[in-house]
Amino acid sequence: RGTQPTLAEFGLDARTEEINRAAVLAVRRAVGDRAYASASIGPCGKMLKPYGDTDPQAMYDSFRRQTAALAAAGVDVFCIETMFDLAEAKLAVQSAKETAPAIPVLATMTFSPTPRGFFTIMGTSIQKAAAGLQEAGADVVGSNCGNSTELMVQIAAEFRRHTTLPMLIQSNAGLPVMKNGVAVYPETPELMAGKVAELVAADVNILGGGCGTTP
């Protein structure tokens, strides 16, 4: 949540570059050269017109400000994730590619099951997401978050029908339930691991974990 509009809610928008640089440096201190530093870029927290009052150029500029700071700090990968609005996702991808063309851009959206198939809460289908993200310049496409690893297998299979790009899947450990005031994710490591073969069979190229998972 390092975009300027989100930070502005806390009076920190003037420190957008500083905060994003600090995040990258913290990762570098932790992992050194043993791992890639991936910059997670989520929704900016504002709605584009006509659903909200944000102009596309203003949203693009906010993403550009963030991606420029991340690139200058030496991030290895941009991971644009948990997107619901395809138009916003495309602006984020475009800003990353135009800021630093040599840095790979991974772009994932979050889908829910409906009687008509999988859609984001803004009504974007997997087919439209795959085409739109590729058109914007994403190097890798896919899905993150979601309802369960089981459903992610279905989402991955649907994505592969509509793209030849490398695919990234990062599932939550199911939907959380509250127990004694604490959010508990129901899927066990064994359950999630048991779905890996199915995800690989669906031609997923990069596997990760979302909320409720650990390294």
Label the model's feature ranges.
Residues R1-P215:
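Domain-level signal for soluble alpha/beta catalytic cores
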